[in-house]
Amino acid sequence: MNSFRFTKMHGLGNSYIYVNQFEEHLPEELLSDLAVKVSSVYTGIGSDGMILICPSDRAPVKMRIFNSDGSEGKNCGNGLRCVAKYAYEHKLVEETSFLIETLSGLVKAQVEVDEGKVVSATVDMGEPRLLKSDMPMRGEQGSETINEKMIFGGREMKGTAVSMGNPHIVFYLDDIEKAPLTTMGPLIEKDERFPEGVNVEFVEVENENELHFRVWERGSGITQACGTGACAAAVSSVLNGYSKRDTDITVHLAGGDLIINWKNDGRVMMTGPAETVCEGEFFIS
């Protein structure tokens, strides 16, 4: 294989290179290295990683996500919306509501269509998991981490841990523009308390229905948006008394807005845009 076709898509600036494995059949042994190569802004296409849209025995399509460092992730909210858009527009599915298989399980997606094009997608992100063992996170495995004091690099911080199929730790501050992403993000991501690493979110509460959000993503660093992170931020804000259940919460990310609702039945719904940037052919060197 000397080349493959790709589609670059983004959800609020969180961009990935999407590959249709129904047609391309990239070999397993190349996936990690290819993710690193295509993600490079210097020698590749430029993205936060690579997402494969694959056949599935359990759903119409399966999503596999590889971060820009080559590691494989379990879930990606922005990626799910883009996969939903791609699957519908490329006729991999016929209905506007369908399932997507991920490493975290089956996810239900609903697309909003205008003149044959998907303009937004709502994804059922499932139920948040709050125990340390769910993250995983070192400590008392049967306990939750809500507004818990922690020390990172000599700095005391209060964090809330939420798993949305991948691990998140949420911190609150008064001014989102002062979020210490470059200093604290990589330090916390690789802290020994999180044996598999962690996504790091900083949140400023505007009011009970609006949050300002910045993220350091595990395996990718600073990104414009993180769908599972926005879900974790909304769940954390309910747990800490800033927001309410069964209410639309607008999360303002660097790349735009997502609507998150932690329903009374326990499931978290995420609504937002998905856009195609370009299509092309990538040559493997």
Swiss-Prot record:
Q: Known SUPFAM superfamilies for this protein?
A: Diaminopimelate epimerase-like
Its subcellular locations are: Cytoplasm
Q: Name one Pfam family in it.
A: DAP_epimerase
The top EC class, named as a word, is: isomerase
Q: What is its EC number?
A: 5.1.1.7
Where is the catalytic site?
76 (proton donor), 226 (proton acceptor)
Q: Which GO terms describe its molecular function?
A: diaminopimelate epimerase activity
Record's catalysed reaction(s): (2S,6S)-2,6-diaminopimelate = meso-2,6-diaminopimelate
Positions bound to substrate: 14, 67, 77-78, 166, 199, 217-218, 227-228
Which Gene Ontology cellular component annotation is one that this UniProt entry carries? cytosol
Q: Where is this site: Could be important to modulate the pK values of the two catalytic cysteine residues?
A: 168, 217
What is an annotated GO biological process for this record, any one? lysine biosynthetic process via diaminopimelate
Protein biosynthesis as a keyword?
no
- Family note: Belongs to the diaminopimelate epimerase family.
Q: What is the protein's given name?
A: Diaminopimelate epimerase
List the source organism.
Bacillus licheniformis (strain ATCC 14580 / DSM 13 / JCM 2505 / CCUG 7422 / NBRC 12200 / NCIMB 9375 / NCTC 10341 / NRRL NRS-1264 / Gibson 46)
